[in-house]
């Protein structure tokens, strides 16, 4: 939940508390001797349990920061896109995104995401403007707070279909769009 930032009309603060639950008795005395489990807490919301990716000795049954990163880009795009469609009188009746990100590791163990690709599959009600629905994906990227805050390319491969009897497949976008994050 955001709170208005004091003295700044259009600024909002977001807070999270992270608690590490991985001390197995000896802290971090060895790399293999501690757990990677943690909880993220937000006022008034359920805790989120997380861990490292299994390649970093994490629990594969828990979400990791990389999962959250890809999901935050995907969900921010979704919410921006739905708002734009509603304002443009485009009736979205279903939306799914098979988003993915590529993390490249350095020899020293660090690294960074190389890119994230969003693959939204959108179903529109009959009578909706399919061409405009395609175009709004780029506008949604420009409006997405998370995408505007990252320094990697966020690619878009939308598929859109009009809900009609017998037409069960989403059509691929006329082109794949690449939206670079702003400096």
What are these regions (language model features)?
Residues 1-71, 82-183:
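Extended beta-strand/beta-hairpin segments
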């Amino acid at each position: 939940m955001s709170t208005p930032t004091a003295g700044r009309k259009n600024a909002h603060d977001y807070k999270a508390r992270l608690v590490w639950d991985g001390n197995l008795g000896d802290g971090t005395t060895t790399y293999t001797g501690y757990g990677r489990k943690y909880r993220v807490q937000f006022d008034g919301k359920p805790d989120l349990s997380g861990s490292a990716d299994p390649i970093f000795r994490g629990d594969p049954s828990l979400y990791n920061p990389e999962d959250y990163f890809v999901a935050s880009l995907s969900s921010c795009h979704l919410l921006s896109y739905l708002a734009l469609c509603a304002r443009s009188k485009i009736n979205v009746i279903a939306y799914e995104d098979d988003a993915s990100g590529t993390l490249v590791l350095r020899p020293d163990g660090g690294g960074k995401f190389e890119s994230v690709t969003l693959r939204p599959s959108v179903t529109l009600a009959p009578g909706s403007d399919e061409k405009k629905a395609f175009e709004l994906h780029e506008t949604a990227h420009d409006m997405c707070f998370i995408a505007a805050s990252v320094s990697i390319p966020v690619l878009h491969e939308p598929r859109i279909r009009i809900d009609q009897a017998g037409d069960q497949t989403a059509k691929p976008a006329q082109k794949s769009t690449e939206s670079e994050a702003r400096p």
